[in-house]
From Swiss-Prot:
It comes from Bacillus cereus (strain AH187). This is Chromosomal replication initiator protein DnaA. The lineage of its organism: Bacteria, Bacillati, Bacillota, Bacilli, Bacillales. One of its GO terms (cellular component) is plasma membrane. PROSITE patterns: DNAA. Residues 1-92 are annotated as: Domain I, interacts with DnaA modulators. Keywords: ATP-binding, Cytoplasm, DNA replication, DNA-binding, Lipid-binding, Nucleotide-binding. Pfam families: Bac_DnaA, Bac_DnaA_C, DnaA_N. The keyword Nucleotide-binding applies.
């Protein structure tokens, strides 16, 4: 891997001479070499937009530059960090009892060097998840085991998992840390059965110190893989090895997940990550700009942060898009230029943000229920049923976590919210009167 990095660094020095400084700073400086397989050099771009731009505008120039350096005609492929994490890694040929050696090769290959605790921006939506991750990294298998982190796409779950891995390796270089997606776990498991190497597969993942497994929800419906992961989990937990799991939803909401797995995921700590608030989004943009050596006016930071509120990946992508647009038309970056650069990805009128309070008020109007009754202990049908409808709509129409929804309904447990959602979802399939009432509530909320 060191030789590939040296080659790419040499290529970057040559490319810096061939393109303008803004273009180099915007597109090429932040790239890294990932691997070289069969005359295909894979380069990591910081985000999706940068990847697409590099593919369409710089592939030929990069290929020519590499030919000048090596005399070999290499094809160029670009990936982003998320897909890099799921790339197949070329490991040394398997040998008898070599599972532990294989594990030692994985950490450096599979962890993104940019995803550390130092580069993670802490805000109200991720503060607890960050604290829990740091506690796990400082004392693996002693703080929370397993640690289960859930939240939407692009909110920092993978970043925290990689940060845990980096921290453990930094403080214990001999630690065997493995990061992979559940999809990769599934594919390797299937291949091990096909190639009659099930024992090697088990040794590989049951002889590690820290297992970081991403997107566990993709195990849903895969009975054999769930069975294998169940035994892997047990083996590691019994040996006091740390397990960290991420998902886009809490364990109880993962469909067709075996109860015995679900219960094990709940043994340790479950924490969520929610979309960043305005202050956190601005802090993320400032940190990104500083890391990339970009001089971005505060008004532009504020504009982007106000317009992009879904996730961190889109936020950083918007910043790069603005910088790229500025370099292309050779104009200084300001709020007007940012608006022009982002006009294709920002709708003219942003959809109305609906709060749990709005939902309670609308449901109360339709069912003649007082606002305070939604939080009260009353269990009469005239109150309990509208309350369940309000919980259902809160789950459907807001980004609030289950605990947050429960809190807004008088501090009820998240399982109560799940039950309400399941009940109303089922009734809506057959109850035409309920369908009309929910439609009426939705009209009020528009």
């Amino acid at each position: 891997m060191e030789n590939i990095s040296d080659l790419w660094n040499s290529a970057l020095k040559e490319l810096e001479k061939k393109v303008s400084k803004p273009s180099y700073e915007t597109w090429l400086k932040s790239t890294t070499a990932h691997n070289l397989k069969k005359d295909v050099l894979t380069i990591t771009a910081p985000n999706e937009f940068a990847r697409d731009w590099l593919e369409s505008h710089y592939s030929e120039l990069i290929s020519e530059t590499l030919y000048d350096l090596t005399g070999a005609k290499l094809a160029i492929r670009f990936i982003i960090p998320q897909s890099q994490a799921e790339e197949e890694i070329d490991l040394p040929p398997s040998k008898p009892n070599s599972a532990q050696d294989d594990s030692n090769h994985l950490p450096q290959s599979m962890l993104n060097p940019k995803y550390t605790f130092d580069t993670f921006v802490i805000g109200s939506g991720n503060r607890f998840a960050h604290a829990a991750s740091l506690a796990v990294a400082e004392a693996p298998a002693k703080a929370y085991n397993p640690l289960f982190i859930y939240g939407g796409v692009g909110l920092g779950k993978t970043h925290l998992m990689h940060a845990i891995g980096h921290y453990v390796i930094e403080h214990n270089p001999n630690a065997k840390v493995v990061y992979l997606s559940s999809e990769k776990f599934t594919n390797e498991f299937i291949n091990s059965i096909r190639d009659n190497k099930a024992v090697d597969f088990r040794n590989k993942y049951r002889n590690v110190d820290v297992l970081l497994i991403d997107d566990i929800q993709f195990l849903a419906g895969k009975e054999q893989t769930q069975e294998e992961f169940f035994h892997t989990f047990n083996a590691l937990h019994e040996e006091s090895k740390q397990i960290v799991i991420s998902s886009d939803r809490p364990p109880k909401e993962i469909p067709t997940l075996e109860d015995r797995l679900r219960s094990r995921f709940e043994w340790g700590l479950i924490t969520d990550i929610t979309p960043p608030d305005l202050e956190t989004r601005i802090a993320i943009l400032r940190k990104k700009a500083k890391a990339e050596g970009l001089d971005i006016p505060n008004e532009v930071m504020l504009y982007i942060a106000n317009q992009i509120d879904s996730n961190i990946r889109e936020l950083e992508g918007a910043l790069i898009r603005v910088v790229a647009y500025s370099s292309l038309i050779n104009k200084d970056i300001n709020a007007d230029l940012a608006a022009e650069a982002l006009k294709d990805i920002i709708p003219n009128s942003k959809p109305k943000i609906i709060s749990i309070y709005d939902i309670q008020k609308a449901v109360g109007d339709v069912y003649q229920v007082k606002l305070e009754d939604f939080k009260a202990k009353k269990r009469t049908k005239s109150v309990a049923f509208p309350r369940q409808i309000a919980m259902y709509l809160s789950r459907e129409l807001t980004d609030s976590s289950l605990p947050k929804i429960g809190e807004e309904f008088g501090g009820r447990d998240h399982t109560t919210v799940i039950h309400a959602h399941e009940k109303i979802s089922k009734l809506l399939k057959t109850d035409t009167q309920l369908q009309k009432q929910v439609e009426e509530i939705n009209d009020i909320l528009k």
